[in-house]
């Protein structure tokens, strides 16, 4: 009797690594998770030890096998999904990183980004990469490492150093240094990749003095990149055949294969990605243009809007204000509110993300009266998440010219039924919650399985992650627009408040 076969997804995140084993129905059979240390050398700096990431991945691979009694020989293929933009530079011969991994959130390279803007490169970089110039992306992180590690620039020019985002690092380690590759979605977040020509951009590389030899080969999101070295996969030589950055993997896991399909992951922040098809559309409203995925020689582009504060606003109610004891309680409190939704919370704790990109804005509250209750405040905080999502969705519709009919949702806060119903109401469209909320890992598994024939084609996947619950808009148009106008006024007032402060500082 032949053994049943499975797909393993390695989900390497910002604070932890996970390995999840899926069966042919797309069901989770086993999983293992391990956190690893965050390193904060200075205020605003965030780093990881790349070897600790690798150790955590080895640990969770073992954990997933132990929990399920599945053997390495039963794994048909491996898919990898990862925290995007985080940058590792290592010695080609020894495989030892020359510096910590600089994490996507880290602001230590902001002066390099500011210099690029001052030197007038914003338009050129936006047109080629689809991105805004920011320390968020990998390019400035590579430049920082080459500047700050003695002899690094010279070694890079001699071909002695390699660069990779976390997907690249893990494939390099799993194959014991045999394969140095990345995929379209991760390359598109480096600020070095020309997403129109699908090549590393020589002009940007020259501008930043980054040797091209350091960079990995860019591959599609679904093909066999190499096989695991047996001693790194508990005796198994298994194809690694799917890769995508976490948000793009979620787009694929949500089966958003057609232009105009949109997914939103409600995590700590909120990441909204729209499939725009095979045409690259540059945003004129501060959204990012990126690559959603590329399979079989065809690339699907995407528009992305990032909201800084979503689920973390609920954590603030719990840990900061002590208004609730657990995050799920926020739903009960909000449903108990009897207010007419006149309170607005603008959770700009670290500034405002898309489409405002106002890093100076700070959190504010409007519309309080003597009768405002704790329940009203909790409801207003939940509603702020939905209002921010509408800001991005409206912008996406303008940029793309596509009329969005449905929003596919996943992530922790998507379990809040009150929030999902209000989201449907304020957008005036259906909200489809994924039945399987493991959409990021599932997307990586789908990409890997397609490449080895575990699933026949993309049509076969459509049966596997059916919609869980559908939330339909039920609010009348005039009330919906009245509430949203109030939100826009609150955001404007928030921005004016910090602008006035800046003006006062300048006057001094």
UniProtKB/Swiss-Prot annotation:
Q: Which of this chain's residues are annotated to bind ADP? A: 14, 18, 268, 311, 412, 416
Q: Which residues carry this modification: Phosphohistidine?
A: 232
Where on this chain does glycerol bind? 84-85, 136, 246-247
Q: Which NCBIfam families match?
A: glycerol_kin, PRK00047.1
Its gene? glpK
Native organism is Streptococcus pyogenes serotype M4 (strain MGAS10750)
Enzyme class (EC, first level):
transferase
Any one annotated GO CC term: cytosol
What name is this protein filed under?
Answer: Glycerol kinase
Q: Enumerate the catalysed reactions.
A: glycerol + ATP = sn-glycerol 3-phosphate + ADP + H(+)
One biological process term from GO is: glycerol catabolic process
EC numbers listed for it are 2.7.1.30
Q: Name one GO molecular function term.
A: ATP binding
Looking up InterPro entries in the UniProt record yields: ATPase_NBD, Carb_kinase_FGGY, Carb_kinase_FGGY_CS, FGGY_C, FGGY_N, Glycerol_kin
PTM summary: The phosphoenolpyruvate-dependent sugar phosphotransferase system (PTS), including enzyme I, and histidine-containing protein (HPr) are required for the phosphorylation, which leads to the activation of the enzyme.
| A Pfam family matched in the record | FGGY_C
Tell me its family: Belongs to the FGGY kinase family.
- The entry marks the following residues as binding ATP, namely 14-16, 268, 311, 315, 412
Q: How is its activity regulated?
A: Activated by phosphorylation and inhibited by fructose 1,6-bisphosphate (FBP).
